[in-house]
Each structure stands twice: as C-alpha cells, then as structure tokens.
C-alpha cells in the first residue's frame, strides 16, 4: 500500500503555513511589479512553483536531518525518521518535485533561470548550515526571497527600488519569524549541537526580533508614501502592526508552545500586507 499520508506529511502539505510564508512575499512582488494586476498565467506559475519548491525544500531538509530529527521532540515522528518513508522514496519524490518546478520555469524568461538555480543551491545548502553557521536563518532568508526577483523579471520589470525595499522587508521578516520558530526547539538544539539565531542571539533574542519587525514594518511606510497610498493602506498597516505586537507578546516568556504560535501568526501578517499592497495599487 502506498503511504499517502506519510508522503503528505513529508511534503508538509498538512501544514500549509510554510507554503503561505513563501507565497505571500512572491505575491507582494507580483502585485508590485504589475501595478496590482498580475496575469492569471503568472499567478498560477508562481503559486504552483511555490508549492513544489517548498515541498522540495522539506524533503531536502528531512533527508539531511533524518539522524538529527529523532533527538528533537517536535520532529522525532517525521516520516523519514520514523521509517514510514524510505530514503529512496524521498529521493524519488524530490526528483518529481524538481522536474515539475523545471517545467514551470521553462515558461518564464531566461533570466529567471539564474535566480532559480541560486534558489535550488541554497535550498540544498540550508540544512547543512545548521551544523556550522551560527545564524543559518540568513541562508533561509536568501532561499525564501528568490521568488521576489523572479516575479519582477517574469513581469518584465527591472530590479528597481520597489524590489530593493521588498527584498529587505522579506529578508528581515524571515529572520524574525524563523527565530521565533527556532525558539521552539532551542533546548533540544542546544543538546545536539544544532545552531540557530535563537541560540546565537541568546538573551537578546526578543530585542533583535522586535528591532527586525520595527525595521521591516517601517519600510512598508516608506514604500506606501512613495506610492501615495490611500488611507486604507495605513489602516491595514496598523492592523498588521497589531499582529506584530501580539507576536512579541507571545514570545516574551520564551515558552516553546507560545513561540511556535507566534511563528504561525506570521501567516496573518503576510495576508494582511498582501491586501494592503493590493489596495494601495488600485
């Protein structure tokens, strides 16, 4: 019998937050690059590409961490670690996902290919960075930001000031929310020697997260003022600021389950700012 349930969990399709956190910045970029009206074709290419590459990243991560995950309470029952999915099955799934992503890539301009290659290389590198890099979230930030330049190029736009602002917003956002995520596993990671910004930032973790959130949310104001955005953008911006404040409240006591909840709440921030960008460009 084919272990469909195990495959779904290996690809994290049962946990769509990862897909959403990769999709929202790409959607922001598509809306910015197309003045609020991206084509259906572009939307479908990038949406499916997001799902395929995020799932591929999960498979790569689980292959690399299969001997580590059994020592972490949250990950010890992942399909590869528990034996529900074999290593050969995981490689076959990875091959299928990469081929599907390549087929989508062929529909985009050639310059998108270069960023896609960078994205794949970083995706393969990231799990191993947790062994030797004190801040592997920096690598994750690059990997999860490659959809932004690809969206601009696919839309026929240069990598302009909008791109720079958005890239900085997303890069900072990723480091902030993934540090929250890493705070969930901090005790286990310290025992087994896995590195993360949650460990590297030490007692300054909450302060640095707060500074990153203030920085990136302020950049949205810079963008909005430059675009002469109407009042409804600022209303949604204030709503999103409330979400960030709630996240900071959740992580204040550094309770693992609350840190994980704070990470999940990031999805609401991405959604609200997607609406804000869309309305600002109408």
UniProtKB/Swiss-Prot annotation:
Biological processes, Gene Ontology terms: ubiquinone biosynthetic process
GO cellular component, one term: plasma membrane
InterPro entries: HB_polyprenyltransferase-like (IPR006370), Prenyltransferase (IPR039653), UbiA_prenyltransferase (IPR000537), UbiA_prenylTrfase_CS (IPR030470), UbiA_sf (IPR044878)
Annotated TM spans: 17-37, 40-60, 90-110, 113-133, 135-155, 163-183, 207-227, 231-251, 262-282
Catalytic reaction list: all-trans-octaprenyl diphosphate + 4-hydroxybenzoate = 4-hydroxy-3-(all-trans-octaprenyl)benzoate + diphosphate
Class of the enzyme per the UniProt entry, highest EC level: transferase
Co-factor(s): Mg(2+)
Domain of life (superkingdom): Bacteria
Membrane topology, record value: Multi-pass membrane protein
Disulfide-bonded cysteines: none
Cellular compartment(s): Cell inner membrane
GO molecular function, one term: 4-hydroxybenzoate polyprenyltransferase activity
Keywords annotated in UniProt: Cell inner membrane, Cell membrane, Magnesium, Membrane, Transferase, Transmembrane, Transmembrane helix, Ubiquinone biosynthesis
Listed pathway(s): Cofactor biosynthesis; ubiquinone biosynthesis
EC number: 2.5.1.39
Major subcellular site: membrane
Family: Belongs to the UbiA prenyltransferase family.
NCBIfam families per the UniProt record, alphabetical: ubiA_proteo
Summary of the function given for this chain in its UniProt record: Catalyzes the prenylation of para-hydroxybenzoate (PHB) with an all-trans polyprenyl group. Mediates the second step in the final reaction sequence of ubiquinone-8 (UQ-8) biosynthesis, which is the condensation of the polyisoprenoid side chain with PHB, generating the first membrane-bound Q intermediate 3-octaprenyl-4-hydroxybenzoate.
Name of the molecule in the record: 4-hydroxybenzoate octaprenyltransferase
Organism: Legionella pneumophila (strain Corby)
Gene: ubiA
